[in-house]
Amino acid sequence: MGYESNRSFNKATGAGFIIAMGIVYGDIGTSPLYTMESIVQGQGGLERISETSIIGALSLIIWTLTLITTVKYVWIALKADNNHEGGIFSLFTLVRKYAKWLIIPAMIGGAALLSDGALTPAVTVTSAIEGLRSIPAFHEAFGQQQLPIVIITLAILAVLFLIQRFGTSIVGKVFGPVMFIWFSFLGITGLINLFGDFSVLQAINPYWAIHLLLSPENKAGIFVLGSVFLATTGAEALYSDLGHVGRGNIHVSWPFVKVCIILSYCGQGAWLLQNRGKSLGDINPFFAVLPQNLIIFSVILATLAAIIASQALISGSFTLVSEAIRLKLLPRLRIFYPGETFGQLYIPAVNLGLWLAASFIVVYFQSSAHMEAAYGLAITVTMLMTTTLLTVYLSHYQKVKKVLVGLFFTVFIFIEGLFFAASAVKFMHGGYVVVIIAAMILFVMAIWHKSDQLFYKYLNSSNLNDYKEQMDKLRKDETYDLYHTNVVYLTAKMDKEWIDRSILYSILDKRPKKAKVYWFVKVNVTDEPYTSEYEVDMLGTDFIVCVNLYLGFHMRQEIPRYLRTIVTNLMESGRLPQQNQTYSITPGRKVGDFRFIILEEKLINARQMPGFERFVLQTKEQIKKITASPARWFGLHFSEVTVETVPLVLSDVKNLEIHERISEENQGES
C-alpha cells in the first residue's frame, strides 16, 4: 500500500464520520434497547432492584465499554490491519506464519461470529417492535399478547433478507444519516433524563462496578456480567468493518458514539432510581423514560436503527464467509455482486441460512427477553479467540515487549473469561441454539481444512519436463483432430514443473487432446486482500504455459478475465506465437479459442484408508454436492468448459491383494 493510501486510511472526514455511523456502530448502537431491561429482570424486576445494583450496573457498562471496546478494539485491534482490512480472518492471515495451531482460534472465532449473525437481527428488531406496547392504542388492542410482535418482526426480517439480492447501495446512502439521528436521540433523551437524578454519575467510579460484584444486594451474582456484556457485543463488528470506513473515521466517530450511548444508559439509570420499588409490570427502561408523545417516533427510529444494525451484520457475514472461502476454510458458494462496488456481496446460501435461523429464533424464543438469555455467549468466544490472535500479533509481528504483551493477555483473558463464565449459564436458557449453529459451522470448517491437507497428501505429481516431447509430438500429429487451440487446466497443485498427474492422464491417456498451447493455471490466495499478480513459466517451449495467479483473499477469481491479459502480454513480448484466426467476427483476431478442463477427483480405495481420513474425505464429497460448481466459481459460465472425473490416486494406500484360483484340471495341464 502506498503513502497516499495509508494517509487516506488514517484520515478522518465529515463524510467518513457519517458513513461510519451507518456501517460500524449498528450493533453496539442498538444495545441500549435491551441491555438495561435484561439487567433489571436479572435483579428481580423494578420492584426489587436496589440503588447499589443500578449504579453498579451502570459502572460495569461504562467500564466494559471503556476497557473492551475503547482500549482493546479502538486503540489496539484497529492497528492490526491487513492492508487496511480488519476482522478475525484478516488478523489470522497476519499471524498464521508463526504457528500452525493458530488456525484453531481463527476457525472457532469465525464460526461463533457467524452464528451471532443469526441472533442479532432477531434480538434487535424484536426489541424495537416491542416498543409498540408503550403506545396506548396498541396496548388496548393487543394487551400483552406477543403474537402481533412476532408477526411484525418476521415480516420485517423477510423484507430485509429478500432485498439482499438487489444490493443495498441505494438504501445504504441513508444509513449514516439515520444512525446519526439515532445516536443524537440517545444522547439528548439520556441527558434530559439524567437531570432527574445526577447521583447516577457516581457510576464513573469503577469502585461501584467491583462493589456490585461483591455485594449481597446483587441478586444475579457474577452472572450480572452476562447482561452487562450485551452493551459491548458490537465491538467485534467494529473491528471487522475497519476496511469499509478506515481507521481515522472510527477514531474520530467513536467518542461521539460512546458518549451518546453512555448518556442513554445514565438516563435509564436515573429513571430507575426514581421509580424503583414501583409495581409497573414488565417494562423496558429505554421506552419507559420517554414522554408519551415521543413513543411512536422512538419506535420508528428504533426499528430503523435495528434494521440498519441487522443489515450491517448481514453484509459482514457475507464478507466473513467470502474470506473464509478464499482461505479454504469453507466450501465454495455462489457469490454475486449486485452493487456498484466490489465490496457489496450477496451469497444466496448464507442469506437463506441467516433468514431461516433468525426467523426460527424469533418463533422459538418469542420475546426479546428470552432471546437476551441466549445472546452474548457466541461473541464472548469470538473475543477470546481475537485476544489470542492479537497476543501473537503483538509479540511476533509488532515485537512489543514481552511484559506488555503478557499484561495485555492477562488483563483481557481475565475480563473476557469472566464474561464467558457469566454467559455460559445462558447455555441452558437458550444459548444452546447459538452453540449448535456455531458447532455446525465449525464442523464444516474443520472438515474443509483437513480435507484440503489430505488432498495434497494423497495427490501424485509428475514432472512436465518428462512429457514435453510427447505433448509436442501430439500437437503435431495429423492423425488427431485439433481438440482446441488453447486447452486450459485449472490445478490446485503445481510447483514449478511438477504438476498433478491426473492432468497428464487427461491429456495423453483418457483421450489425447491435441492443442496448439497447453495452459496450466493455479490460483494462489495471498494474505494481502487486493493482490492481483501472476508468474509465467513456459519450460523453454512455446506451447506449454504454467501460470501462477496471485490473488488477494478479497479478489474475485475470474480466470478468463486474467487469462485474456496474460495471453496479450505473452504475444506482445514474443514468447507466445500469434494464433491468427481464419474465421472471426473480429478482424485481425490473433488469439484462438479456449477450452477449460476441470478435473474432479473422486475417492477410490476408501476402505483401505484410516477411518478418520475416510470420514473427512467422504464428508467433503457430500458437502460439495450443494456448493457452487468450479466453473461458476472461476467465472467460466460463459466459456467452453469440460468437466472430467478422475480417480484420486492414493499413493500411500496399498493395492488390494488378490490371488488366482487354480483348479485341479489346470494344475494337471501345467
Curated annotation (Swiss-Prot):
GO terms for molecular function: potassium ion transmembrane transporter activity; symporter activity. It holds the Pfam family K_trans_C. InterPro entries: K+_transporter (IPR003855), K_trans_C (IPR053952), K_trans_N (IPR053951), Kup (IPR023051). Its main location: membrane. GO terms for cellular component: plasma membrane. It is a multi-pass membrane protein. The chain crosses the membrane at residues 14-34, 58-78, 101-121, 147-167, 175-195, 196-216, 220-240, 252-272, 294-314, 345-365, 374-394, 403-423, 427-447. Transport of potassium into the cell. Likely operates as a K(+):H(+) symporter. Belongs to the HAK/KUP transporter (TC 2.A.72) family. PANTHER family: K+ POTASSIUM TRANSPORTER, OSMOTIC STRESS POTASSIUM TRANSPORTER. This is Probable potassium transport system protein Kup 1.
